Amino acid sequence: MKPVGEFDHDYCRKIQSACLKAILEASIDPATNTATLRNGEISKALLRISAMLMATSKEASSPTQIRHLAETYAKGCRQLITANRASMDKDGGPPFPVLHQAASNS
C-alpha cells in the first residue's frame, strides 16, 4: 500500500471490487438465486457513503471548500458515467440486466 497522501490505484480497485461484491451479496434473492441491482437505491447508498467520507476530510472545513469538493466530485462522476456509457455502447450494453426506475429523493 502506498503512503497516505499518495493516490493508490491498487487500493482503489480493491475497495471498488469489495463494494461491488457487497452490493451483489446484498441484492441476492435467495428464492431465485438472482440479484436485482436497483440503480437508484445503490447510487443513493454510495453517494451517502461518499459524502460521509468526504465530510471527514480537511478539504470539507468550510462551505466554499465543500462546494469545491462537490464540484470536483461531480466532474469526476460525469467523466466516469460518460466513459462507462461509451464502453457499454461499444460492447452492446451493460454486463448485467438493469431494472430501470425513476430516481427518488430519499
Report residues per predicted region.
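Solvent-exposed interaction surfaces and binding hotspots enriched for charged
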Residues: 1-106
